[in-house]
Amino acid sequence: MLDIKRIRMNLDEIKAAMARRGEKGFDLDAVVALDEDRRTILQEVEQMKNEQKTVSKEVPKLKKEGKDVSEVMEKMKTLSAEIKNLDVKVKEIEEKMEEILLRIPNVPHPDVPQGDTDDDNIEVRTWGEPTQFSFEPKPHWEVGVNLGILDFEAASKVTGSRFTLYRGMAARLERALISFMLDLHTDEHGYTELLPPFMVNRASMIGTGQLPKFEEDAFKIPQKDYFLVPTAEVPVTNIYRDDIIEGDQLPIKYVAYTPCFRSEAGSAGRDTRGLIRQHQFNKVELVKFVRPEDSYEELEKLTNNAEKVLQLLGLPYRIVRICTGDLGFTAAFKYDIEVWMPSYNRYVEISSCSNFEDFQARRANIRYRPDTKSKVEFVHTLNGSGLAVGRTVAAILENFQQEDGSVVIPEAIRSYMKGFEKITAK
């Protein structure tokens, strides 16, 4: 959520930022007008309260002098009723303001490139060379089906489209990757591991920015008004909702594995085969709470932590700086890590690493105290996939496939696979 004071003081700048994003559907002038009404009423309330105090002081004085206080008491009663009515008006205005503010996206950082689609993202760096084959490589879903380790038909029968049943070595590979990623981020990168709930309440979804705008993309449990987590970012960030963190605790670094659930509304026809776009998938997520002055340095570190997974697995990738049109609702700045997928003949997103600045913190009211003598401020929040597990499985099946249909297991995870070096058909 944007600070209303920031909008009021820099209205033209905020309008220009929204224009950079190509965003519409909300009225910045309206929210500024509502804020003006709110502040005017609050001034009236303050004046009435001061008058109320002055009048209340007259009562004991008049009583002491033996004079009638009924007129003064009636005036106090009238002032009290007027204040109560104005308080109701302020609450109504604030609710209208919040309704608008919750739908306004974050302001892009000045270094975010201008653009409309992912074609306008800017490549920052690459690692490794695209995998070359002496044969025509198969897409990962064919590799998995031929090996008997991915069963899309059974998953479709059990549930529906965009679900996968992992069998045998695929299930072991998925589990191995989750453990490998968690161990790397805790043991080498200093994150604390969490295992959060896989369902969250509405306040949590609002806090991280999924609601109200993206409710159609969420899986809801209507009996409780709970939501299946679209990402571990939601429960982990909301641990500190409405809390004040002591400054000496920052930065706080968490890593969490969760299954993720997304309806993928609006993605019909995109990546309909394989593991790339599923309704349910596993992900290891990195989340940071940091001081504002440190947030961009911490974003670089977080991105480095995520890409280390791919380096150890030996998977070629690139990092791109995301343009305004592809930035997403909550981020001020974002990197995507894209892994090379031979069957696509292109790089495919496997991680997004974002700095939200104080956007989520304002929505979730997450503050910190810089030191014992300072006023509280909003923290900056960051997160990134470290990594999307299903897409990592897909990348391994594609990049390490052999001409005989087998798949070489990356050396870094063989200890998690009971020493198996290769996946072969049974």
From Swiss-Prot:
Superkingdom to which the source organism belongs: Bacteria
State a single Pfam family of this protein: tRNA-synt_2b
Q: What disulfide bonds does the UniProt entry report for this chain?
A: none
Keyword terms, alphabetized: Aminoacyl-tRNA synthetase, ATP-binding, Cytoplasm, Ligase, Nucleotide-binding, Protein biosynthesis
Gene Ontology MF: a single term: ATP binding
GO BP field: selenocysteine biosynthetic process; seryl-tRNA aminoacylation
Tell me the gene name.
serS
- Can the keyword tRNA-binding be found in this entry's annotation? no
Q: Where mainly located?
A: cytoplasm
Query: Known catalysed reaction(s)?
Result: tRNA(Ser) + L-serine + ATP = L-seryl-tRNA(Ser) + AMP + diphosphate + H(+); tRNA(Sec) + L-serine + ATP = L-seryl-tRNA(Sec) + AMP + diphosphate + H(+)
Native organism: Alkaliphilus metalliredigens (strain QYMF)
- Protein family according to the UniProt entry: Belongs to the class-II aminoacyl-tRNA synthetase family. Type-1 seryl-tRNA synthetase subfamily.
Q: Where does L-serine bind?
A: 231-233, 285, 385
State the function annotated in the UniProt record.
Catalyzes the attachment of serine to tRNA(Ser). Is also able to aminoacylate tRNA(Sec) with serine, to form the misacylated tRNA L-seryl-tRNA(Sec), which will be further converted into selenocysteinyl-tRNA(Sec).
Subcellular localization is given as: Cytoplasm
The record, for CDD domains, names: SerRS_core
Q: Supply the domain comment.
A: Consists of two distinct domains, a catalytic core and a N-terminal extension that is involved in tRNA binding.
Indicate the quaternary assembly. Homodimer. The tRNA molecule binds across the dimer.
PROSITE patterns found in the cross-reference section: AA_TRNA_LIGASE_II
Q: Does the keyword Membrane apply?
A: no
Q: Name one GO cellular component term.
A: cytoplasm
Q: Where does ATP bind?
A: 262-264, 349-352
Q: Which HAMAP family match?
A: Ser_tRNA_synth_type1
Identify the metabolic or biological route this protein is part of: Aminoacyl-tRNA biosynthesis; selenocysteinyl-tRNA(Sec) biosynthesis; L-seryl-tRNA(Sec) from L-serine and tRNA(Sec): step 1/1
The protein in question is named Serine--tRNA ligase
Q: What is its EC number?
A: 6.1.1.11
